[in-house]
Amino acid sequence: MTGCPPPGGLWVRRLAMNEKFAAYAHPEVLVDRAWIEEHLDDPNVRIVESNEDILLYDTGHIPGAVHIDWRRDLQDQTVRDYIREEGFAELCRRNGITESTTVVVYGDKSNWWACYAFWVFTLFAHKNLKVLDGGRDHWVAQDGPLTKEVPSLEPVPYPTPPKRRDAEIRAFFVDTLAHAKAALPLVDVRSPGEFSGEVTHMPEYPQEGVLRGGHIPGAHSCPWKTAANDDDTFKSKEELAKIYEVNL
């Protein structure tokens, strides 16, 4: 019947999830499995999978999801930088994303690279963005539906953004140096080995290495996974507050 709540345990879990989301500064950004399943056939929603392991998508993905490879699609292939304005517009066009499309990202490793994709979309001021809480691994653990069928999409219009929002949301060398000298909070989300200087890059990412080992003076180590539960969902607002209070 229209308007009836989901059955039994699913309804209880969804209420708990909604309460968790409501405590965040931007609860509208997070969605759960029930939300995804309600919007699988929504033409105004594009689900995007972006993983550390770029081969995972082909082994099965959420029905209708497209694949964005963080190395090939989001990074400049010549210089160490993000794609430029026209590259972003072309990425959206070929993946069936318009200016008004709601883009929902998810991926492996507690949404590590999915959130990277989310950030790149923010860099170009795409308005409607969401993250599937728990990402790919949580979806699979919940027996969420998977398919190997790759959606066939016709290109759609997407205007070239007037500029990349570098000044608004990126910190460059001079910004970070001034921040550190002022003893303001700095969080290093890399691996403990990279933070200590034991390694200059994670084995999987030689192209992401640094010239010198160690960390910026005054920075606190708080690896990405610290913000996630064992089931890959994000920790609660209260848990996150404690983590960053200790580290800052």
Residue ranges and their predicted role:
Residues 20-100, 176-248:
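Positively charged, proline/Ser/Thr-rich regional signature most characteristic
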Residues 18-26, 82-182, 198-199, 214:
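Thiolate-centered catalytic microenvironments shared by cysteine-dependent enzyme domains
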